[in-house]
């Protein structure tokens, strides 16, 4: 059997690529329509991704032994634990952009492309790029805390945004490249012909576009949302990649463990999102967790920079997340109030 430069036979690399790409294709094909994902569907797809990961672990066990399979499962579990915070940051991002439920799966799964690329880069170069981590975390801690404040102020207001002209992300980015300030279906980019057609509509008579010049392509608010999701993936990679590299220095083990965990976490996001319809106080718990995550990022980052000795360990973070979620669920059971579906119908 021919071995690759990463220490595994070509057959193993092919199995990993075929299994992961095939599973992504199945997932995307089954969710090709822009429809909100139900709790049952989200739960089943979460199980699907766990089964796919364990199938690869089984292959490693049969062909490379128990030790290699154990390293993969350890890395997989570690990535899951370290990326739990990312679930709540995703909620914050979607809340900030007021992305309709029907487009969220598309946004998250296009975000996978960035995750695949950036995690691959981090694994390839080891820890040299990770030295930037603390500075990225400080910036992201501020953004997460600010988003939590915005969610707290908005309360139960989940209305879609018709025009993003005053949105902070739009105002920050429009000076660099042209943006169409409204959602146009699930499109991420529009060409000049499509933009001209939109500008011809009476309701868009007062719309101004980015730099005010004609361009080959225009980004939409959905594209900006994908970019922020990508940024969150990169930011959390600064935490998880060194931890998993500490488990195994074998690139394929590290990369495959991260990828299967990330793919599964995205479906777990939809489980949490669907539960919000039934657990009316879960969103309050999410807001509390966002403040906690911001504090954790800030403490850990500044400890790396200034060595003040205060930080929050991954295990402590997991206990806090589980505890706050449990309180949110308990409060929803004891004080159910009105589910969102009833409030919208009344």
From Swiss-Prot:
Keywords: Cell membrane, Membrane, Plasmid, Tellurium resistance, Transmembrane, Transmembrane helix. The chain crosses the membrane at residues 6-26, 42-62, 81-101, 110-130, 132-152, 227-247, 252-272, 286-306, 316-336. It comes from the Bacteria. It is a multi-pass membrane protein. InterPro entries: Integral_membrane_TerC, Integral_membrane_TerC_rswitch. GO terms for biological process: response to tellurium ion. It is found in: Cell membrane. GO terms for cellular component: plasma membrane. Coiled coil: none annotated. Its main location: membrane. Pfam families: TerC. Could conceivably alter the intracellular level of tellurium in a manner leading to resistance. Alternatively its presence in the membrane may provide a barrier to entry of the tellurium ions. Belongs to the TerC family. This is Tellurium resistance protein TerC.
């Amino acid at each position: 059997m021919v071995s690759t430069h990463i220490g595994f036979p070509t057959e193993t690399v092919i199995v990993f690529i075929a299994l992961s790409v095939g599973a992504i294709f199945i997932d995307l094909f089954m969710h090709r329509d822009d429809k909100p994902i139900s709790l049952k569907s989200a739960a089943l797809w979460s199980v699907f991704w766990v089964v796919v990961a364990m199938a690869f672990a089984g292959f490693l066990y049969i062909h490379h032994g128990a030790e290699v399979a154990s390293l993969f499962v350890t890395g997989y579990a570690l990535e899951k634990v370290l990326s739990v915070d990312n679930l709540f940051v995703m909620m914050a991002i979607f809340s900030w952009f007021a992305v309709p439920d029907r487009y969220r799966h598309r946004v998250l799964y296009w975000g996978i492309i960035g995750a695949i690329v950036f995690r691959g880069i981090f694994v390839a170069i080891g820890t040299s790029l990770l030295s930037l981590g603390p500075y990225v975390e400080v910036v992201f801690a501020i953004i997460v805390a600010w988003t939590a404040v915005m969610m707290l102020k908005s309360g139960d207001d989940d209305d879609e945004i018709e025009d993003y002209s005053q949105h902070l992300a739009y105002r920050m980015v429009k000076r660099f490249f042209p943006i169409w300030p409204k959602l146009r279906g699930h499109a991420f980019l529009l060409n000049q012909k499509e933009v001209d057609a939109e500008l011809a509509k009476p309701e868009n008579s007062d719309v101004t576009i980015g730099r005010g010049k004609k361009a080959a392509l225009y980004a939409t608010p959905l594209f900006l949302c994908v970019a922020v999701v990508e940024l969150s993936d990169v930011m959390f990679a600064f935490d998880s990649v060194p931890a998993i590299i500490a488990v195994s220095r074998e690139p394929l083990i590290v990369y495959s463990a991260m990828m299967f965990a990330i793919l599964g976490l995205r479906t777990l996001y939809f489980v949490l999102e669907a539960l919000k319809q039934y657990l009316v106080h879960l969103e309050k718990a999410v807001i509390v967790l966002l403040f906690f995550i911001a504090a954790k990022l800030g403490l850990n980052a500044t400890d790396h920079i200034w060595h003040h000795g205060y930080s929050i360990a991954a295990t402590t973070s997991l206990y806090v997340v589980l505890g706050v979620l449990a309180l949110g669920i308990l409060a929803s059971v004891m004080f159910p109030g009105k589910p969102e579906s009833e409030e919208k119908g009344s």
